[in-house]
Design a protein with these regions (language model features):
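N-terminal Rossmann-like NAD(P)+-binding subdomain of aldehyde/semialdehyde dehydrogenases
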Residues: 1-132
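Donor nucleotide-activated moiety binding/catalytic core segment of transferases
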Residues: 135
Length: 135
């Protein structure tokens, strides 16, 4: 039985502010396979605050650094493919081949597309202020 009751907030694993255990059921067997904690309003507020604070530095992060982080994420995702398939199969009750070919592949495809789009995306555009082609 997996027991994962902590939340990842502001760069560290933290206990929930109030205990609120929840059994996660494998739909294919009807048996519980994990116990997680459902967050409270206080936990949600902490996570939102941390995300807002993180955005202050993230918005200044260079395109190159963002690409590097996304490519690292993509490598780790693919290296842990079998774990992702197993987790998705267990959580949704899907056959392993379906979880691999559909759900896990979708995550990999989205990751690759985000990287591709970011490589070609220009965050800034210099307008010719002397031309008549203004908005």
């Amino acid at each position: 039985m997996i027991k994962n009751k902590n939340f990842y907030i502001n760069g560290k694993w933290v206990s929930p502010s109030k205990p609120n255990d929840f059994e996660v059921i494998d739909p294919s067997t009807g048996e519980p396979f994990a116990i997680i904690s459902l967050g409270s309003t206080e936990d949600t507020d902490k996570a939102i605050s941390a995300a807002k604070n993180a955005f202050e530095t993230w918005r200044e992060t260079s395109k190159e650094k963002r690409l590097s982080l996304l490519e690292k994420f993509d490598q780790i995702y693919n290296r842990r493919w079998d774990e992702m398939v197993k987790a998705q199969s267990t959580e949704m009750g899907a056959p392993l081949d379906y979880a691999s070919e559909t759900h896990t592949k979708m995550g990999a495809d989205i990751s690759k597309n985000i990287i591709k789009i970011l490589k070609d995306f220009n965050f800034e555009h210099q307008f010719d202020l002397k031309s008549n082609n203004r908005i």
